[in-house]
Amino acid sequence: MLRLTRNWTRTARFTAIWLFALTTVLPLTFAQTIDKTNAHSTASDPVDFSQPLTIRWRYESNSTLNLTPAFDDERIYLPLASGTLVSLMGASGQLNWRSEMGGELSASPVADQRGVYVASETGKPDSGARRATGALRLLGREGGVTQWMRTLAMPLRGALTLGNGKIFGGGSDGKIYAFDSANGEARWAYDYGAPFNSQPVVSGKHVYLGSEDGNLLALDEETGKLLWHYRTKGAIRGAVANGNDIVYFGSGDGYVYAVNATNGRLLWRKRTGAGVEAVVRTNEELLVASLDNFVYKFSLAGARLWKRRLPGRISSQPLVTQLGALFMPFSSSAGVVLELRDGRQINLLPTGEEIATSAAPIAVGAVVLLTTEHGLLAFAAPREKPPLK
């Protein structure tokens, strides 16, 4: 897995990230309403994309990664190179703590009231070691102290997910794991065989996860038993969307799929111009981001409602509100907000540099946070000036 450190030249780093974007999607992925444990795609109402948003604060670092930060109602947990994680207050950017675990972080973290769950790895592919060593740990919310840690034969990839008292992750060893979130004890492991680089999504009694060999798997979230799988012709790296007993997802083969959540039978599929990076359900429609630089809107029955071209390829999940969706096009210098109704551009969030990361945008309260090559930017509505006396 590509990791980015401060000693890269700008040209070499951008080239590497561009190749990364064509082969790997790291989901945010985070459901930002009531459930923060699944795909990072839906922001709560305090974010109003119809009004101007300006930079409220910034955290500077040349060690950001292609991993989406974790968050809770108040705090952000930013992954950095060399196994480092920092905790920041969402409203002000104030540093709470910094934890240095060593090695490298291997998957996007996830947070709850206990703290933040972090996957890491030690050993490098070129070090001569036959196998890398993975680890999963819980860092406490207040001080970043390790509460528990479990070692794994191989590291977890993509993103972690919380659900029903368990933490889920897919590994580079082809296994899907479930751990008790309170103490880290293994609940089950399913050995699929092909590696994973995506984010599990928990819905009811099922957990869904896409594989590098093009299969979407549905497992019993309590036992890990495989319920069904659906095969496509491309890697599945984005998180699935679901509702009304239907699962929607995209594949590297360029198609958007809708399958029955109970048995995995195909209901419909629709072609885009390139590999599909993200599928998000919004009310009664689907937003689809493709590597052809277009954003598509489909009805839940598969009818295309509109498509809009963006100034670069999209390699991360969008951040969606009731009004609009924020996308981070590669090589552009601003996040782009499209109105959900007709796809027209309604806002821009200038970053001051080319976007060169697959980390997804997130929101904490009314603050929108964008990971850049040089740190974290926090956007919010301008503060109201006090009335003149």
Regions found by a protein language model. Name each.
Residues 1-10:
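N-terminal secretory signal peptides that target proteins for export/translocation
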Residues 32-63, 94-101, 135-140, 145-152, ...:
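Aromatic (tryptophan-biased) beta-strands that constitute blades/sheets of beta-rich domains
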Residues 35-38, 62-84, 103-136, 150-177, ...:
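Repeat-blade elements of multi-bladed beta-propeller folds
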Residues 89, 140, 180, 220, ...:
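Structural recognition of the beta-propeller blade-terminating site
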Residues 15-27:
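Bacterial N-terminal signal peptides
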Residues 52-57, 322-350:
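Short, positively charged, low-complexity/disordered linker segments
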